[in-house]
Amino acid sequence: MGIPTSSVSEEQESSEGQDSGDICSEENQIVSSYASKVCFEIEQDYKNRQFLGPEGNVDVELIDKSTNTYSVRFPTAGWYLWPATGLGFLVRDVVTLTIGFGSWNQHLALDLQHHEQWLVGGPLFDITAEPEEAVAEIHLPHFISLQAGEVDVSWFLIAHFKNEGMVLEHPARVEPFYAVLEKPSFSLMGILLRIASGTRLSIPITSNTLIYYHPHPEDIKFHLYLVPSDALLTKMIDDEEDRFCGVRLQTSPPVEPLNFGARYIVSNSAHLEIIPTELKLSYRSPGEIQHFSKFYAGQMKEPIQLEITEKRHETLVWKTVVKPVDIQLGAASAPPAFSGAAFVKENHRQLQARMGDLKGVLDDLQDNEVLTENEKELVEQAKTRQSKNDTLLTMVEKKGDRALELLFRSISERDPYLVSYLRQQSL
């Protein structure tokens, strides 16, 4: 398979720079102004088949179940996010999109699939638009962790699969949860990383642990998955488990990034047999068979502590406790009303690890009289990003639920992808 890499001449870049600069400035303002409205909708409705948009939720229609293809019509200009997949669009006008999903194994040449310098960074989408010029940006989700500074964003490429083969394009910019494709062409597309030759391959990724139990009066069965943080992949696993009456337990993902390709050991406090005990953190496209560990817990009369340890360095990377009360054999109760304050409390460690620049958040909290000038300076004086985050979270938690609600609202406006990501993990 040929790999022609798309390129733009210096003259083209120069001639287009002025116009595109003005457009991008306007588009960035659209994202900023609509983010508040969009993320407020996260509190109200979080259905899988809905985009969050500037004027509320927009339904997604399944038009071909056999190919898992969807259609959506955006009624106005603005920024739209599909939390179930992490896919986002910035549009200039009314537009109709058709969205399908592909498998890397079916389209990526075999010699590249097993080449140590290439790494799949996210799902593969088949996107068409009518009219195409109405779409200003596509935000393609990825699960590569940028927070440790170990990944060079120049490694990110958008792979387009066309009749002539795979065409590679550099994204306009790379953000913590997505890469931006400006003035997009439409095709089967996804994110690939081309690692510099000679680079030691140890790529940190955000990951997720999924635990499902299968009720039985004599012997409750558990399945535990360790997978990249791909919302679409999680949904596909949910659907597959649901076919066999599996019920997902709410758990937090690992706080720190895990290394792609590393091996991890699953253990438990009850000395129950786990098969297999070892899981490799790898990416398999949605629709492919996903690896998991399985164990049986009898009638589950005592709590079970589960742990995942990195095999090479014997480092504990994740643990949780499953209690008998968590296993609901009866009908599921109605979910409680969403609370921004509860969200911040429950995700303290995740927010501490993942929140970025706090300048805008601190300004919001000072404007709303949650923080004084002295308290704001105290946060800013902390030496590291995580210590700044922890200082802020601890300080606001002491001020009560109203302060936490205002903090949640500010984080939603400033970093909607982070809030969407954390909400998706808890579904």
From Swiss-Prot:
GO molecular function annotations of the record: cysteine-type endopeptidase activator activity involved in apoptotic process; peptidase activity
Region span, UPA: 187-336
Alphabetical list of InterPro entries matching this protein: CARD, DEATH-like_dom_sf, FIIND_dom, NLRP_Inflammasome
Lineage: Eukaryota, Metazoa, Chordata, Craniata, Vertebrata
Subcellular compartments: Cytoplasm; Nucleus
Gene: CARD8
Annotated site (Cleavage): F186, S187
Keyword Hydrolase: yes
EC numbers on record: 3.4.-.-
Regulation: CARD8 inflammasome is inhibited by DPP8 and DPP9, which sequester the C-terminal fragment of CARD8 (Caspase recruitment domain-containing protein 8, C-terminus) in a ternary complex, thereby preventing CARD8 oligomerization and activation. CARD8 inflammasome is activated by Val-boroPro (Talabostat, PT-100), an inhibitor of dipeptidyl peptidases DPP8 and DPP9. Val-boroPro relieves inhibition of DPP8 and/or DPP9 by inducing the proteasome-mediated destruction of the N-terminal part of CARD8, releasing its C-terminal part from autoinhibition.
UniProt region (Disordered), positions on chain: 1-23
Subunit structure of this chain's protein: Interacts with DPP9; leading to inhibit activation of the inflammasome. DPP9 acts via formation of a ternary complex, composed of a DPP9 homodimer, one full-length CARD8 protein, and one cleaved C-terminus of CARD8 (Caspase recruitment domain-containing protein 8, C-terminus). Interacts with DPP8; leading to inhibit activation of the inflammasome, probably via formation of a ternary complex with DPP8. Interacts with NLRP3. Interacts with IKBKG/NEMO. Interacts with DRAL. Binds to caspase-1 (CASP1), CARD16/pseudo-ICE and CARD18/ICEBERG. Interacts with NLRP2 (via NACHT domain).
Summary of the function given for this chain in its UniProt record: Inflammasome sensor, which mediates inflammasome activation in response to various pathogen-associated signals, leading to subsequent pyroptosis of CD4(+) T-cells and macrophages. Inflammasomes are supramolecular complexes that assemble in the cytosol in response to pathogens and other damage-associated signals and play critical roles in innate immunity and inflammation. Acts as a recognition receptor (PRR): recognizes specific pathogens and other damage-associated signals, such as Val-boroPro inhibitor, and mediates CARD8 inflammasome activation.
The FIIND domain, residue ranges: 51-336
The protein's name in its UniProt record: Caspase recruitment domain-containing protein 8
Domain notes per entry: The disordered region is required for activation of the CARD8 inflammasome.
GO biological process, alphabetically ordered: inflammatory response; innate immune response; proteolysis; regulation of apoptotic process; regulation of canonical NF-kappaB signal transduction
Cellular component terms (Gene Ontology): NLRP3 inflammasome complex; nucleus
Keyword Glycosyltransferase: no
UniProt entry keywords in alphabetical sequence: Apoptosis, Cytoplasm, Hydrolase, Immunity, Inflammasome, Inflammatory response, Innate immunity, Necrosis, Nucleus, Protease, Ubl conjugation
Region (ZU5): 51-186
Enzyme class: hydrolase
Domain CARD: from-to ranges: 336-426
Record's signal peptide: none
Originating species: Pongo abelii (Sumatran orangutan)
